[in-house]
Structure formats: C-alpha cells, structure tokens
Amino acid sequence: MTSDGTPTQSGRYPAGGHAFPHGSLTGIAQLERHEILYLLDEAEQWVDFNRQSEKHCDLLAGLTIINAFFENSTRTLLSFEIAGKRLGADVVNMHAAQSSVKKGETLIDTAITLNAMRADAIVIRHGSSGAVDLIASKVDCPVLNAGDGQHEHPTQALLDALALRHALEARGEGSEDFTGLTITICGDILHSRVARSNILCLQAMGASVRVCAPPALMPVGIERMGAEPFHDFDAALKGCDVAMMLRLQTERMSGQFIPSAREYHHLYGLTQHRLQRCAPDALVMHPGPMNRGVEIDSDVADMLDRSIITRQVEMGVAVRMACLDILTRKGRGLPGWQGDLGKGQWA
C-alpha cells in the first residue's frame, strides 16, 4: 500500500507486464489461471483498505461508471455502487424500470445509447444469456458482467474464491489456490449463473467440484465442465471441504420443478445433521439471497466457526474495486497494458 493506504499494483508480475490484458470482464471462462490469481491478489489489497476507518480514495476521480441493471438486484448493485464510490468515481445507477427497454428499445439501441454517454466503465446485469457480450461488442469502454441470464456471474465467483482463501488463511491453511479441496455446490444448478462461474473458477484454482440437484434442476452434460454430478445430497456431501448452497430460482422456472419447498428441504436442505457428513471442519457458503428453511437451516447459516456467508459479502466490494481499477487503467493512461480495449474482446 501507499502512504495514504491506497493499494499498489500486485507484485505477482514483473513491471511493464500487465497480467490482465482484457478490455472487459464478461466471464470466468475466458480467464487463465494466472489472471484469476492476479485479480484475487489485487482484491486482497482492497480488503485491507476497506477495513480502515478512512475508506475513500481518488483513484478513479473524474471517471463515470454506469451500473445498468436490467434485472432487480440488491447486494450486487449496492456492492458495485460502494466499490465505485470508494474509488472516487461518479456512479450512476440505471434500473430496469427506468430503462427504455420497457418502452420497446432493442438491446443494441440501448448499447449505442450507453456508448454515446461516454462512460468510463459500464456494469451490466441482464436477464438474457449473452446480453453482456453483445453490449460489450458495441461500446468503447470496459464492461463488467454483473450476471447475465443463466450464463455467468464472474465477480461472484471471484468473491467466493477470495472469501474461501481468507477463511483458509485464518485457519493457518493458506494457499494461493485450492488444490486438494473438494467443494460441493448444491441447489438449482440448471438456472444458476453463479454455479457455472464457480465451477470454472474453482477448478482453475485446483479444486475438485461436485454439483448436486434434483434431476429436473441438473443441466444435461454438466460433467463436460469437469464437475461430478450427484442427485443424492448425502453422497455429494461425504467428506467435502466446502458446502456451497444455492437458492431455488423460481423466477426463472416456467413449470413445476420440485413438489414443494418442504419436500426440497427434506431432500436437499443443509441441516446440522447433514453437515456431519462433510469434513470435520467443512465451511459453509451461500451467494445469497438465502431462503432459510429451504436450502439451508438458520442454525447452519449462522454458525460462527463454519459459515463464511457474511465474509462473502465483504469480499464482494473488494473484488469489484479491483476489477474497476484494473479495467480502467488503460483509459487512465497507466503503463503496462498489453491488450486492446474495445469491441470483440470476448467474442
């Protein structure tokens, strides 16, 4: 950190060699392992910054960030807004109800409109998979994916990885990656962009990933992503080091995928009894929002020694500060950039 508490660039890479050559961040799938580790290292420094009494800097002073959310959000929108403001940027929030999409404007026209506003970065959440890639191809500034349909939610996976790394370090089990860990993700895998991004991120960091869901909520061919599928929750939990629970995304379900919430909890809810099937010191995670009494019991979610759910929320601000900082470096004239900013970065 500098004398005023502002983080300096990670020392993982030699001077002049930029570790993140991408103009936008729309998915984990396009990241190399060293790029994921670089983002986490940069975010690590912002964790310390955010724990100071003075949590504001002028790193992005004079820059404008648009948070364009075409889907409702609470924690993700707040996290990005806080991240931008702590960096000193001017942050403008655009909600779905306020957008011209409600009046019939096409996504391409929306992208053209956003580009004409000359923002320095745009954060986008959209209900359609691939929408963020499309917008990124039409604008001249960095784009961050805050979740698109059932596709990806990259900053969620990064903050989950950072929260897990922090928890392991607190136990004296610190390592830059997750080699040797078995992580079970259980819930609505079919509709979950969080699951997809986490599978990619956790595997890139060396973890073995299991996914568990009722047959109707398990994507066909999920094993092609390298995850081991289970329908039996008890079997999926056996000996795992981390249990990551996901909510049922009823807003994306057009039919009856489960008999009832009560039946789902009976078969797939994480209880104290089920937690005993995991490794003795297994950690519990949930990206939120939680449906207590459905996918997870309150006494499990609130376990001080095992649950790192609130830590996940804390890490979200740090990860998003790091991403905003890194992606705007070329626009701020900083040296060491190897990539090209602009259209088609993730095509």
From Swiss-Prot:
Record keywords: Pyrimidine biosynthesis, Transferase
Single GO MF annotation: amino acid binding
InterPro entries: Asp/Orn_carbamoyltranf_P-bd (IPR006132), Asp/Orn_carbamoylTrfase (IPR006130), Asp/Orn_carbamoylTrfase_sf (IPR036901), Asp_carbamoyltransf (IPR002082), Asp_carbamoyltransf_Asp/Orn-bd (IPR006131)
A single GO cellular-component term on record: cytosol
One Pfam short name: OTCace
EC number: 2.1.3.2
Binding-site residues, L-aspartate: K103, R193, R247
UniProt enzyme class: transferase
Acetylation listed as a keyword: no
Binding site for carbamoyl phosphate: R75, T76, R125, H153, Q156, G288, P289
Catalytic activities: carbamoyl phosphate + L-aspartate = N-carbamoyl-L-aspartate + phosphate + H(+)
GO biological process: 'de novo' pyrimidine nucleobase biosynthetic process; 'de novo' UMP biosynthetic process; amino acid metabolic process
Pathways per UniProt: Pyrimidine metabolism; UMP biosynthesis via de novo pathway; (S)-dihydroorotate from bicarbonate: step 2/3
Purpose of the protein: Catalyzes the condensation of carbamoyl phosphate and aspartate to form carbamoyl aspartate and inorganic phosphate, the committed step in the de novo pyrimidine nucleotide biosynthesis pathway.
Family: Belongs to the aspartate/ornithine carbamoyltransferase superfamily. ATCase family.
Subunit comment: Heterododecamer (2C3:3R2) of six catalytic PyrB chains organized as two trimers (C3), and six regulatory PyrI chains organized as three dimers (R2).
Protein name as catalogued: Aspartate carbamoyltransferase catalytic subunit
